[in-house]
Amino acid sequence: MDLTVKTLEGKDAGKVSLSDAIFGLEPREDIIARVVRWQLAKRQQGTHKAKGRAEVARTGAKMYKQKGTGRARHHSARAPQFRGGGKAHGPVVRSHAHDLPKKVRALGLRHALSAKLKAEEIIVLDDLVANEAKTKALAGAFASLGLTNALIIGGAEIENNFKLAAQNIPNVDVLPVQGINVYDILRRGKLVLSKAAVEALEERFK
């Protein structure tokens, strides 16, 4: 499929052909959901912790004698049913990460790119270069292109002025092409690719 290439000023700068093997798949939500779940589980901190009955600071002595009180036969006040006792089966510090085959991850990225193209939410820019590191000027250029909520993917290196100017614009993320991922594609409205990013993606999935 051919898309018109735009400049930051909003002018046309030719056309680019997008590969059907990357951008032309019928999006499968199940594969995309698997990749997003894998990404979010991998970044989860996992530092949750509740003290069990062996860890709470409380006496280990028997609460009261075994017989003669008419009450239930309790021993430790650390048992979960008591106020101040340990939590039964509480959260422990652990990693939430799980495995996902590389082929499924790659397929998920292609399906996410295809979903964006199908929704007509991909814009290809000629180059990501700013003359000066001024947020106001770049924000104006983005507004004229309709980029109020966007993920911008550049080549292997993002030009420094562009990176500095873009980092204070709300709801706009800028990543090099090697950082492209399914979750960030889906959480932003528009996906903006530089010509270098398109070439790198086609080389990657060749």
UniProtKB/Swiss-Prot annotation:
Residues 63-93 are annotated as: Disordered. Keywords: Ribonucleoprotein, Ribosomal protein, RNA-binding, rRNA-binding. Residues 64-77 have a biased composition (Basic residues). GO terms for cellular component: ribonucleoprotein complex; ribosome. One of its GO terms (biological process) is translation. InterPro entries: Ribosomal_uL4, Ribosomal_uL4-like, Ribosomal_uL4_dom_sf. GO terms for molecular function: rRNA binding; structural constituent of ribosome. HAMAP family: Ribosomal_uL4_B. One of the primary rRNA binding proteins, this protein initially binds near the 5'-end of the 23S rRNA. It is important during the early stages of 50S assembly. It makes multiple contacts with different domains of the 23S rRNA in the assembled 50S subunit and ribosome. NCBIfam families: rplD_bact (TIGR03953). Belongs to the universal ribosomal protein uL4 family. Part of the 50S ribosomal subunit. This is Large ribosomal subunit protein uL4. It comes from Sinorhizobium fredii (strain NBRC 101917 / NGR234). The lineage of its organism: Bacteria, Pseudomonadati, Pseudomonadota, Alphaproteobacteria, Hyphomicrobiales.
